[in-house]
Regions:
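GHKL (Bergerat-fold) ATPase N-terminal catalytic module, capturing the glycine-rich phosphate-binding loop
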Residues: 1-186, 194, 431
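GHKL/Bergerat-fold ATPase module in large chromosome/replication-associated machines
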Residues: 115, 133-155, 175-627
């Protein structure tokens, strides 16, 4: 029995396979089970045209056995098996895939099979946990069985042996534990069950293993019951993925249970999106919009991504490339036989297929959210409460690259409707002469309602959108227009038709007062002007072009030392008694007039939610004027 050397893909390649290509040792079991599944599929396919096989799909199975004393882990199948030539070609040449050759040979005729393997390297991943591997196999139609043995890169042997039935046994001699690695975990029943359910739950043949169970001893007394442990063979995998079933055959409670169990959520999903696509890329997807915001959603710890499967075998737990950032809240699975896998299965080549799937899913999610908005407004508002901010961030991100896709999904609170409305709904209610989509930004709905700048528009019945999140104004700036209507902040300079002319006339009539206030306040304000929009309030602050007060607050919160500051324009209501008192003081008592001017400016700061530049000075001034 001469030892044979691996062919050209020699010791260096095997070392690379074991130590570099695979990042998680636990995936070896996935690879071995996938090979067993391929073997079953090949014989199952042959049975379709060869009655002598005498087996149907329900007769095939994969078995896992553990021998702790010998430290062996065995995976057996009753699939097609291998002969000596197959062993030479498939196991004697690293990275040679018999499954890939099979798929090439049968072509479209094998569309109903689930052959997984492509590269042939998966078998050697077992050397990550085993120091010796024995393969005992007998091919369908052959009388002889063969044994392949190897301890790694030093080569392998092939000898004739006995095996009663067709199939293959992979016997892995598990390495001894080290200080860094506890290989014995792969001899524990609970760990093997965990790995099967994680990676191979949807292999379409039963994966059987004896598991330990506990039962009450027969005849033991009720007051002191005794229990015994026994072994029972159990199927570890569920076999048929729920996403492979017709949607009409799946009950809502089944989808809900799958979601809760799969993604460890206490709440049912708000919406289920089932996708089945054929064509350039064939795939199935089962997506979920969570019914509640994950507790870590707005933290750095949250990871976006969909579980990615190839023919029911888990390839990647969270494939971030399948979801755009604005839909990062979506959970789900994608299963495709068309993906180009790299040699380790763990990393996916960034190829055209993946990009096509991602683009199609983005359109599908947008479409389903649009339907939810149209058909279930209450449900959509619940979704918006949970994830609306993410949609807004999507509008703003990448310099507005996704704004056209997302703008129809936006909701903002309406001053007239007293509830969230879409931009389309706002525009449909605009007055014929109205040119702008008006909005006001503030810390809360209540505070915006009390802003002096909104009073005139609200009294005239003009609808205002209330922006209460820091991203809202950035969103409006990126959109700029909606259905050819420009966004305009009511907190900016004069916005009403003809208002500028009225303000100029008032300023001319009281020029001395405005000049006096500007001189008193100096660089604290860019300009002091008359306001045509103030009704019952004496004063307000408006921002100059470019940066609003809410944006200033945002930048200050993110970077407290930031020098970014919005231009301050002080507007005075010339018809208010406070202005009249100021005007009288300018002539009669300039020192008191300076105090009035300072007080009005501080009041404007408070109304705008901006910090006072001299809080103690403000309180002293109020107390002094009360004397």
């Amino acid at each position: 029995m001469a030892k044979r050397q691996f062919k050209a893909e020699s010791k260096r390649l095997l070392d690379l396979m074991v130590n570099s290509i695979y990042t998680h040792k636990e995936i070896f079991l996935r690879e071995i089970i996938s090979n067993a599944s391929d073997a079953c599929d090949k014989l199952c396919y042959q049975a379709l045209t060869d009655d002598a096989v005498g087996m149907s799909r329900k007769d095939f199975k994969i078995e896992i056995k553990v021998d702790k004393e010998r430290r062996t882990l065995s995976v057996s199948d009753n699939g097609i098996g291998m002969d000596k030539e197959d062993l030479e070609n498939n196991l004697g040449v690293i990275a040679s895939s018999g499954s890939y050759k099979f798929k090439q040979e049968v072509g479209d005729d094998a569309k109903d099979t689930d052959v997984i393997g492509q590269f042939g390297g998966g078998f050697y991943s077992a050397f990550m946990v085993a120091d010796h591997i024995t393969v005992v196999t007998r091919k369908y139609g052959a009388d002889a069985a063969w044994m392949w043995q190897s301890s790694g890169a030093d080569g392998y042997t092939i000898t004739e042996c006995e095996r009663d039935a067709v199939g293959t046994d992979i016997i892995m001699h598990i390495k001894a534990d080290t200080d860094d690695e506890k290989y014995s975990e792969f001899l524990e029943s609970w760990r093997l069950q965990e790995l099967v359910r994680k990676y191979s739950d949807y292999i379409r043949f039963p994966i059987r293993m004896e598991v330990s169970k506990t039962r009450r001893k027969e005849g033991s007394p009720d007051d002191k019951p005794e229990y015994e442990t026994y072994q029972e063979e159990e199927t570890l995998n569920s076999m048929v993925p729920i996403w492979q079933r017709r949607k009409s055959s799946v009950k809502p409670e089944e989808y809900n249970k799958f979601y809760r169990d799969k993604f460890h959520d206490y709440a049912d999903p708000q919406k289920v999106i089932a996708v089945s696509a054929e064509g350039a890329v064939t795939y199935k997807a089962l997506l979920f919009i969570p019914g509640a915001t994950p507790f870590d959603y707005y933290t750095k710890e949250y990871e976006k991504g969909l579980q990615l499967y190839s023919n029911g075998v888990l390839i990647m737990d969270k494939c971030a490339d399948l979801l755009p950032e604005h839909f990062r809240f979506v959970r789900g699975v994608v299963d495709s036989p068309d993906l180009s896998l790299n040699i380790s299965r763990e990393l996916l080549q960034h190829d055209r297929q993946l990009k096509v799937i991602a683009a199609n899913l983005e359109k599908k999610i947008k479409s389903e959210l649009g339907k939810l908005l149209k058909d279930d407004r209450e449900g959509y508002e619940k979704f918006w409460k949970n994830f609306g901010r993410q949609i807004k961030y999507g509008v703003v991100s990448e310099y507005g690259a996704h704004k056209d896709l997302l703008q129809d999904l936006l909701l903002f609170y309406s001053s007239t409707e007293k509830k969230p409305v879409t931009l389309a709904e706002y525009v449909s209610r605009m007055k014929e002469e109205q040119k702008f989509i008006y909005y006001a930004a503030g810390e809360s709905l209540e505070k915006i309602d009390k802003l002096p700048q909104t009073e005139g528009l609200r009294e005239s019945g003009t609808e205002i959108l209330y922006f209460t999140e820091e991203v809202d104004e950035f969103c409006a700036q990126i959109l700029h227009t909606f259905q050819d209507k420009e966004f305009r902040s009511v907190l900016d300079q004069e916005i009403e038709e003809g208002a500028e002319k009225k303000a100029e006339e008032a300023a001319d009539a009281h020029k001395a007062v405005f000049d006096f206030v500007k001189e008193t306040l100096g660089d604290q304000v860019k300009e002091v002007k008359a306001s045509a929009r103030l009704k019952s309030h004496p004063v307000c602050l408006t921002a100059g072009e470019g940066l609003s007060f809410e944006m200033e607050k945002y930048f200050q919160a993110v970077q407290p030392d930031s020098a970014i500051r919005a231009e301050r324009i002080l507007e005075l209501n010339v018809e208010h008694p406070a202005f009249q008192a100021l005007e009288a003081a300018v002539t009669a008592d300039p020192e008191k007039a300076k105090k009035y001017a300072t007080l009005l400016y501080d009041q404007a700061l408070l109304i705008a939610g901006l910090p006072l530049e001299d809080p103690s000075g403000y309180t002293d001034l109020v107390c002094e004027l009360m004397k």
